[in-house]
């Protein structure tokens, strides 16, 4: 009869079963994903491999706890232990990025940006961000996003030759349009933004300057990439990507008034209960980033990205902006007559994961694109170095070369085995 009981009425022992026995379908999906991560080359720039400690914290009993509010100011009882975790995350974020205030509750980078808009803008205000096809992010004013629907979104681009942000265009647009908010950062821009000039332009035009460092926060934490925090009124970030933590968001500022407004925007303005198991995992990841070894990791990420981009360029591929200053590179496939979606598909069949990506001046649809984005953070976490990334570059060239020459999945015969062997040499800890 017990197998007919609803879950809530099932014996306590049934609820103690491990996933493998409690829900075999989902266990198989989870294990298959673990195997995929273990045996493939991960080049998606926004992905990384967290530590076992981060996994442990995120899978902990803190997922059971509701904790609306902030440490010491909760709307629920029984929060003394989750308060320890959130306070630790806040203090570690402040130490790591050298700021006065940190809100660690946003569920994602997108919600961190939304909270900033809610705190600092009124509907219809003007915002100025990097154009999506030039490497910007949806939440910086794309017309399909809330940021482009609720606000008057303007964009700046990159120089058509150097593919670097045209700061003169930023200044001209800001002086002419007088945006309330200027945003620096993106999801596919490989160079260091001029944070000092962004702030100067904002000050000269009466705007607030927001830096979105979601992609390079870990590089900033490791001292390998300039920090926007001293220049921006507000800095937003994710806690995964190069920071190598759980999926989530965070907001940093040195301004007490802005901090109060952001806290109110996050809760109760945008979110209800924070995800305390995720915040605990954020604290763990931030603690890891404070360790001396993380600085070596951050430097290695950039060295590896440069090695990969250099090898791809040597093989005849066009790298947007000619290289990279961070963990990612964008490959313009138009000279090879390839579409981004076809390249993504062929590489995945060969055991190499990338994402299709728009390139400056792209006429293709977002579902097709004319480029791919590659990144080094994940494979660097596995211990790979420049020599391995040059090998990865050779594998990518073999696949795309075969595709260009007429094969639907170029390099199908040779590349998968080589990619799998490289993965086996650098196993994941789980």
Swiss-Prot record:
UniProt site positions, description: Plays an important role in substrate specificity: 240
| One Gene Ontology cellular component annotation held by this UniProt entry | cytosol
Which catalysed reactions does the entry list for this protein?
Answer: (6R)-5,10-methylene-5,6,7,8-tetrahydrofolate + glycine + H2O = (6S)-5,6,7,8-tetrahydrofolate + L-serine
A Gene Ontology biological process term: tetrahydrofolate interconversion
Q: Where in the cell is it found?
A: Cytoplasm
Q: Which cofactor does it need?
A: pyridoxal 5'-phosphate
Q: What class of enzyme is it?
A: transferase
Task: Identify the domain of life.
Answer: Bacteria
On this chain, the residues bearing N6-(pyridoxal phosphate)lysine are 241
Major subcellular location class: cytoplasm
- Purpose: Catalyzes the reversible interconversion of serine and glycine with tetrahydrofolate (THF) serving as the one-carbon carrier. This reaction serves as the major source of one-carbon groups required for the biosynthesis of purines, thymidylate, methionine, and other important biomolecules. Also exhibits THF-independent aldolase activity toward beta-hydroxyamino acids, producing glycine and aldehydes, via a retro-aldol mechanism.
Record text on subunit structure and interactions: Homodimer.
Its protein name is Serine hydroxymethyltransferase 1
């Amino acid at each position: 009869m017990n197998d007919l009981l609803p879950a809530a009425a099932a014996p306590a022992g049934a609820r103690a079963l491990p996933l493998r026995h409690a829900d075999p379908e989902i266990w198989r999906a989870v294990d298959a994903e673990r195997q995929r991560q273990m045996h493939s080359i991960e080049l998606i720039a926004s992905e990384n491999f967290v530590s076992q400690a981060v996994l442990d914290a995120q899978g902990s009993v803190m997922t059971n706890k509701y904790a609306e509010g902030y440490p010491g100011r909760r709307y629920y009882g029984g929060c003394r232990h989750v308060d320890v975790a959130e306070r630790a995350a806040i203090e570690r974020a402040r130490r790591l990025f050298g700021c006065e205030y940190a809100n660690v509750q946003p569920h994602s980078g997108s919600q961190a940006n939304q909270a900033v808009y809610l705190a600092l803008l009124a509907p219809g205000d003007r915002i100025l961000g990097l154009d999506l096809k030039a490497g910007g992010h949806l939440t910086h004013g794309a017309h399909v996003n809330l940021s482009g629907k609720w606000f008057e979104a303007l964009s700046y681009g990159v120089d058509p030759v150097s593919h670097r942000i045209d700061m003169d265009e930023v200044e001209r647009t800001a002086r002419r349009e007088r945006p309330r908010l200027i945003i620096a950062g993106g999801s596919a821009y490989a160079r260091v933004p001029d944070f000092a000039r962004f702030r100067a332009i904002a000050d000269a035009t009466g705007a607030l300057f927001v830096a979105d460092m979601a992609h390079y926060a870990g590089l900033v934490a490791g001292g390998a990439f300039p920090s926007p925090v001293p220049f921006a009124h507000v800095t937003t970030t994710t806690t995964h990507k190069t920071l190598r933590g759980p999926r989530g968001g965070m907001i940093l500022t040195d301004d007490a008034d802005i901090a109060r407004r952001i806290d109110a925007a996050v809760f109760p303005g945008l979110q209800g209960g924070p995800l305390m198991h995720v915040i605990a995992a954020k604290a763990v990841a931030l603690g890891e980033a404070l360790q001396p070894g993380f600085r070596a990791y951050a430097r290695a990420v950039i060295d590896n990205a440069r090695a990969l981009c250099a090898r791809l360029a040597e093989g005849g591929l066009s790298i947007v902006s000619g290289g990279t200053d961070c963990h990612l590179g964008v490959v313009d496939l138009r000279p090879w007559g390839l579409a981004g979606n076809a390249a993504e598909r062929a590489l995945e069949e060969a055991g190499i994961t990338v994402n299709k990506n728009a390139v400056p001046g792209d006429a293709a649809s977002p579902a097709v694109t004319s480029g791919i984005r590659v990144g080094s953070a994940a494979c660097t976490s596995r211990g790979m170095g420049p020599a391995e990334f040059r090998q990865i570059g050779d594998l990518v060239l073999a696949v795309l070369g075969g595709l260009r020459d007429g094969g639907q999945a170029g390099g199908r015969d040779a590349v998968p085995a080589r990619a799998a062997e490289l993965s086996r040499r650098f196993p994941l800890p789980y």
